[in-house]
Amino acid sequence: MERLLNQLNLGVLPYITTKDIEDRLRDKIVAKAKLAFIKDCFEAVVCENGGLFVLTGGAAVTCHIDDDRSALKCIDFDYYGFCAKMFCNLQTNLQKCVDQHYAELDVLTRQVYMSDPLVVLKCYQNGAYRLNGQINLHLNRHIKCIKTQYNDEFDLVRFALQIDITSADGVDEYTDNGVKITTAPLSFNVFFVNVRIMKRPFNADRCIKNFSLFGNEYHVLVSSLQRVLNDQLMCLLKDIFTNKFDYKIERRLKHLKRLFANLPAESYNSCVNDHTDMCLYKEQNETITNFVKKILDISGPALGCRKLMHIYLTTDTFSGQLPAYLTHYVNYPHKSLCDQNWKRFMSCIFSLY
């Protein structure tokens, strides 16, 4: 393992994690599946269960910008209300969707190409996998449901395709105790439906929008424009710090610019110097991502972005501050790029005006 880490830190070995593999599989399988698969999953969630489902994430973006061409690699919801049978019904109905579209999904899975040998690092453990020889992928017929007690605001329920990956000459598993060779498949979760179970009554802004991907008269309940913008800004921050490909960051920026164009004119009238609220100051135990989210939630995306740039230019609040989701990564090699990534994020949000 030490030899792999030396190669990683020298830049000889690319930093590819299990999460990167799962993200690539979403791009190559779910995003390339026929639209009927995502539509069936959407209806399995919304139409067959009680409570209130609010569409969020990338699907909400397509609704607000009336985009009928973007491919969706997952659908995200906020769920308000509680039904004891909801989780079982939801998994059963989504399993039926996968069963119905299995042949197509299986073909897309087998078409995914990965070069060999391939080294994949574990995110939260000091370990890695090295796949030797031709790499083959197989789609498991059964989906997986993962429930997480997330925070005081919501719990998270995610549904995933299970992809088994094997290599012709076996897999070397690197751990603290040495190297173990195995022929057993590696299993990866490809999340295609995410549901946040909200713990508070619904009191947020929402709107009805046409989901043009599904048809001209297909109306859905989505998060408000400002909330969708704030969520996408946080996603942009994560894209930059997790070293997503430039084309993905550019695509995110393109969508953000279209969302900003829909904001009412009065959103731009406030001056950052007119606001001396305490939210401009990061609390001692507050993570940098929570601080950014707080600024955006309190001030809205237009004024919030200007406040963030003002704080960045006049204080050292962001200096050396690594987002919380990266502090838990073991062997993350790009900590030295932290300040450079903050500069890139601020340049990106400046370009939105």
Swiss-Prot record:
Key words, A-Z: Early protein, Host cytoplasm, Host nucleus
Pfam families given in the database record: AcMNPV_Orf18
Superkingdom of origin: Viruses
Reported induction: Early protein.
Disulfide bonding pattern of the chain: none
Signal sequence coordinates: none
Keyword check for Disulfide bond: no
Keyword Transmembrane: no
Subcellular location: Host nucleus; Host cytoplasm
GO cellular component terms, semicolon-separated: host cell cytoplasm; host cell nucleus
Role of this protein: May play a role in occlusion-derived virions (ODV) formation and/or regulation of late viral gene expression.
Protein name listed in UniProt: Protein AC18
Species the sequence originates in: Autographa californica nuclear polyhedrosis virus
Gene that produces this protein: DA41
